[in-house]
């Protein structure tokens, strides 16, 4: 059978829009008149729907609708006599290839009588959604190496990473991809990539992949422009992985790529050494020393940002990398400034009187 032609897709688009889709999807009730007009047997129509509804949500997006229409036309025209057991490769949307692959793997396991009892797979249920700074740095390094010019990541762009995972079957890699990509787009952004890699990391270390994601992440992944905020994740009081296992994720992979697991922040080591480190007032948090500490951090960050800018002017070869480092420090500086301003407002509400530490600061 030939591939879908552009004129054919345009025709399906007109029909799809005529059904007045909601959230870019049409329900069975909306599609029912179109299906019944084909005068095909009810059993065949049901099989077409089952085959086309790839994500099993009871609705069809435009790609799934195109599959439905093409199968119906082929049945009517006699190009095929029966609904195929699975979609031909030429009819599979690239954005849903990973999902179909995962579904086929599960179905194959059922047909072979493979036991998927969670209690017997040797995995634990203590999956941890918290992403430590060290892990996040590793994930960001992989993202920087593999994203395209639009800042997006394709599923197959990480094939070389998948090959280094000894304990993660291909079907579970696809499942992890689908968790962070509920809209089945062909690519995912940085925020989704970080969580995707974290899921693979946890699974590689013996943690069972959850069946869903937290509500906050689910809402984030459903947006066109996610608002991923690591600070919103609550750090647990216990660690579920050893430090050695955390360091091991993607270490071989990054070594092959010549990065040896280093993050972008490793570039700042020469800039933040010596006298630029400042005094650590972390033990005094919650006292008036917190104000002194914040003011010192703001000053240090401003000085460090200035050095980064001067370095960028002198060395244009690392322009893209410098921009990323600069952006990350600008965001950190903004956060610290807001934290300091908020503390100042709270002090104004509480009123003055007391500590005498402002005299020390002066």
Curated annotation (Swiss-Prot):
<dbReference type="GO" id="GO:1990964">
    <property type="term" value="C:actin cytoskeleton-regulatory complex"/>
</dbReference>
<feature type="domain" description="EH 2">
    <location>
        <begin position="135"/>
        <end position="224"/>
    </location>
</feature>
<dbReference type="GO" id="GO:0030479">
    <property type="term" value="C:actin cortical patch"/>
</dbReference>
<keyword id="KW-0175">Coiled coil</keyword>
<keyword id="KW-0206">Cytoskeleton</keyword>
<keyword id="KW-0472">Membrane</keyword>
<dbReference type="GO" id="GO:0005509">
    <property type="term" value="F:calcium ion binding"/>
</dbReference>
<dbReference type="GO" id="GO:0030674">
    <property type="term" value="F:protein-macromolecule adaptor activity"/>
</dbReference>
<comment type="function">
    <text>Component of the PAN1 actin cytoskeleton-regulatory complex required for the internalization of endosomes during actin-coupled endocytosis. The complex links the site of endocytosis to the cell membrane-associated actin cytoskeleton. Mediates uptake of external molecules and vacuolar degradation of plasma membrane proteins. Plays a role in the proper organization of the cell membrane-associated actin cytoskeleton and promotes its destabilization.</text>
</comment>
<comment type="similarity">
    <text>Belongs to the END3 family.</text>
</comment>
<feature type="coiled-coil region">
    <location>
        <begin position="287"/>
        <end position="348"/>
    </location>
</feature>
<dbReference type="InterPro" id="IPR018247">
    <property type="entry name" value="EF_Hand_1_Ca_BS"/>
</dbReference>
<dbReference type="Pfam" id="PF12761">
    <property type="entry name" value="End3"/>
</dbReference>
<feature type="compositionally biased region" description="Basic and acidic residues">
    <location>
        <begin position="339"/>
        <end position="350"/>
    </location>
</feature>
<dbReference type="InterPro" id="IPR000261">
    <property type="entry name" value="EH_dom"/>
</dbReference>
<dbReference type="InterPro" id="IPR025604">
    <property type="entry name" value="End3"/>
</dbReference>
<dbReference type="GO" id="GO:0007015">
    <property type="term" value="P:actin filament organization"/>
</dbReference>
<feature type="domain" description="EH 1">
    <location>
        <begin position="8"/>
        <end position="98"/>
    </location>
</feature>
<feature type="binding site">
    <location>
        <position position="64"/>
    </location>
    <ligand>
        <name>Ca(2+)</name>
    </ligand>
</feature>
<feature type="binding site">
    <location>
        <position position="55"/>
    </location>
    <ligand>
        <name>Ca(2+)</name>
    </ligand>
</feature>
<dbReference type="GO" id="GO:0003779">
    <property type="term" value="F:actin binding"/>
</dbReference>
<keyword id="KW-0967">Endosome</keyword>
<keyword id="KW-0106">Calcium</keyword>
<keyword id="KW-0254">Endocytosis</keyword>
<protein>
    <recommendedName>
        <fullName>Actin cytoskeleton-regulatory complex protein END3</fullName>
    </recommendedName>
</protein>
<comment type="subunit">
    <text>Component of the PAN1 actin cytoskeleton-regulatory complex.</text>
</comment>
<dbReference type="GO" id="GO:0030476">
    <property type="term" value="P:ascospore wall assembly"/>
</dbReference>
<keyword id="KW-1003">Cell membrane</keyword>
<feature type="binding site">
    <location>
        <position position="53"/>
    </location>
    <ligand>
        <name>Ca(2+)</name>
    </ligand>
</feature>
<keyword id="KW-0677">Repeat</keyword>
<keyword id="KW-0963">Cytoplasm</keyword>
<keyword id="KW-0479">Metal-binding</keyword>
<dbReference type="Pfam" id="PF12763">
    <property type="entry name" value="EH"/>
</dbReference>
<feature type="binding site">
    <location>
        <position position="59"/>
    </location>
    <ligand>
        <name>Ca(2+)</name>
    </ligand>
</feature>
<keyword id="KW-0009">Actin-binding</keyword>
<dbReference type="GO" id="GO:0006897">
    <property type="term" value="P:endocytosis"/>
</dbReference>
<feature type="binding site">
    <location>
        <position position="57"/>
    </location>
    <ligand>
        <name>Ca(2+)</name>
    </ligand>
</feature>
<dbReference type="InterPro" id="IPR011992">
    <property type="entry name" value="EF-hand-dom_pair"/>
</dbReference>
<dbReference type="GO" id="GO:0061709">
    <property type="term" value="P:reticulophagy"/>
</dbReference>
<dbReference type="InterPro" id="IPR002048">
    <property type="entry name" value="EF_hand_dom"/>
</dbReference>
<dbReference type="GO" id="GO:0016197">
    <property type="term" value="P:endosomal transport"/>
</dbReference>
<dbReference type="GO" id="GO:0005886">
    <property type="term" value="C:plasma membrane"/>
</dbReference>
